[in-house]
Amino acid sequence: MAAGVAELDHLMIKVDSLKAATEQFSRMGFDVTPESHIESLGVANRLILLWPRRPGVANFLELMSVPDSENVDPTMAHVLSASEGIKMIVHLAVDIEKFVATIRERETWVDPIWDIRRQWQTPDGESQTIRFRVTKPVPGGAPFTINAYQPNVIGQYLQDRFRHHANGARHVAAVTGVASAQQFAPAVAYFEDLYGIAAQRAGEGIAEIKPRDVTLRIVTATSFAGLYPEIGPVPLQLPCLAAVTIEVSDLHGVARLLAANDVSHVRRGQPAGIVVGPHEACGVTFEFVPA
């Protein structure tokens, strides 16, 4: 891939309370990892781990909050400002220096990389030092907030004990970003250039870019309303990342689970899927589709 990234690895979702978010996502049938703190950035997270389609990459949702607003890194405070919802696409880099160099061809980027170290205990009790080289959010003209990271090990994101979800979730298949009609073409062009591939048009005001196994779908606000009429009018601050598509092993099972847990949802026949609106999922529209 042109920018030195291997995959759209995970989505960072801002939540006001990790405890409340865990309760919400558990009602939707997701297993959630224990709370973890990244002290150097002043943030806390819990993960929803899923199954990547190839070795060497991860596939998950990161629920992130700010435990103490007085001690959060200013950059992260900005990313996690405003309301709940998807705040950033995080790419897995095969060469983080190449990713930075690609961005620097078009933007000035001073001191772009955080070097983070933390301890992690494997399921068999072994202690490992995890080193993350993480870029700050890409500056300038990126239509949606993006960054990249390069961990020295990836096993912490592939723990089977947290990947057997009651809703049968298998894979983050797509993320949908919404732009105004005027922003749409430049947004598509930005990611075509970043990934070095052409977008596929999937309808009026809908473009899909699939650098590997996860699709970035860019749509206009009008097209977003057409894709998800079930959730009704949604106030969106454009541009924004608004929806995630999750592949599941049993759509009927998801419907039964959501009904049993009193999670408001709409089942549709064509294309087959179940939609949960942002009021039920920390500001994110969830679309469950057959794997």
What are these regions (language model features)?
Residues 1-8, 13-32, 43, 50-116, ...:
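Glyoxalase I/VOC metalloenzyme domain signal
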Residues 38-42:
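Acidic-and-aromatic substrate-binding clefts and catalytic sites of carbohydrate-active enzymes
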